[in-house]
């Protein structure tokens, strides 16, 4: 008998149907069409159902997208802009999807892959630069980061740790307490926890250590746990010298803009040489992105850059083509016990 006419706190039938469809791998579009409901209604049913399941069975939480994120007390979901709500909804309906771009060594042998985001929005596929700048909410950044981390874990498991997968950590997430929890969840989801070195985090160069002292602490704690940390966007157009005495990274990635400028700007070339020399002295890796021609590849290789990313190596591919790209770039390279960033 119900007390005071209240309904039990279990799943409703629509919520159960939504959860079963999610766990069976049905796309949001197919499930919404089959049930004759809108994507928004399906999203609300999934969200409500997942919340109830996690409350009663917290051990199931790591298997759900974004479940390791603690809601920000100062920033409830209702405070998101209309664009950010649409973006979070697109993540759950899989309209935001990953693509993978290879990172190769000087022999053009595969070392890793960076995971990039694309958005199938209203029939057009948006590149990351077309929607990421419009995200201001910390919560929206956390949900997107959790989504990409989950893709990285799945691919490390699927491909037995053959190469590393790099995930971008935006400045808004770099100092957040949730980052450490998310990474611990990711480690637990790896079939072999020692493969955590295959999960590389790219911190944006505009992460402000002076303003957010927590960022440096997060980086240090992540490195102690075995994760490899890379500084992304070195010497970009808006670059300021990162406090390298405060934080030491495992790798440094030259921004595409300075790679493009090096052939006509002696100052840009000098900066590249200085970073390469610093990496050699500190036993760090030096990568270059935006390598879109054989000429750039050869010049950077001659300077001492040891890893390369760009269309001259391979264009980004969808998850269904990752194995094929890995085979194309594996060549006859000898297997290594560890994967250096």
Features from the language model and the residues they span:
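Basic, Lys/Arg-enriched C-terminal extension of HTH/homeodomain DNA-binding domains
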Residues: 3-6, 50-78
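Active-site core of bacterial EAL-family cyclic-dinucleotide phosphodiesterase domains
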Residues: 72-134, 309, 316-318
């Amino acid at each position: 008998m119900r007390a005071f006419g209240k309904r039990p706190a279990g799943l409703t039938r629509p919520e159960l149907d939504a959860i079963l469809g999610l766990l069976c791998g049905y796309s949001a579009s197919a499930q919404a069409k089959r049930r004759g409901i809108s994507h928004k209604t399906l999203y609300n049913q999934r969200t409500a159902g997942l919340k109830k399941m996690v409350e009663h069975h917290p051990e199931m939480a790591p298997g759900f997208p974004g479940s390791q994120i603690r809601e920000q007390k100062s920033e409830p979901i209702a405070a998101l802009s209309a664009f950010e709500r649409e973006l979070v909804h697109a993540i759950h309906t899989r309209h935001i999807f990953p693509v993978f771009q290879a990172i190769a060594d000087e022999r053009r042998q595969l070392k890793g892959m960076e995971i990039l985001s694309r958005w199938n929005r209203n029939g057009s596929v948006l590149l990351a630069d077309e929607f990421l700048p419009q995200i201001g909410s910390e919560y929206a950044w956390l949900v997107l980061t959790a989504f990409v981390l989950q893709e990285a874990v799945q691919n490390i498991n699927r491909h037995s740790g053959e190469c590393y997968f790099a995930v971008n950590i935006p400045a808004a997430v770099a100092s957040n307490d949730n980052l450490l929890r998310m990474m611990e969840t990711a480690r637990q989801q790896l079939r072999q926890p020692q493969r955590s070195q295959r999960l590389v985090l790219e911190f944006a160069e505009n992460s402000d250590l002076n303003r957010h002292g927590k960022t440096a602490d997060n980086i240090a704690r992540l490195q102690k746990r075995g994760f490899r940390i890379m500084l992304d966007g070195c010497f970009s157009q808006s670059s300021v010298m990162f406090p390298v005495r405060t934080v030491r990274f495992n790798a440094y990635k030259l921004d595409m803009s300075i790679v493009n400028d090096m052939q006509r700007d002696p100052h840009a070339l000098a900066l590249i040489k200085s970073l390469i020399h610093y990496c050699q002295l500190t036993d760090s890796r030096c990568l270059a992105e935006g390598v879109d021609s054989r000429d750039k590849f050869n010049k950077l290789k001659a300077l001492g850059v040891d890893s390369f990313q760009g269309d001259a190596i391979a264009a980004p591919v969808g998850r269904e083509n990752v194995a094929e790209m890995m085979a194309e770039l594996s060549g006859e390279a000898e297997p290594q016990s560890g994967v250096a960033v």
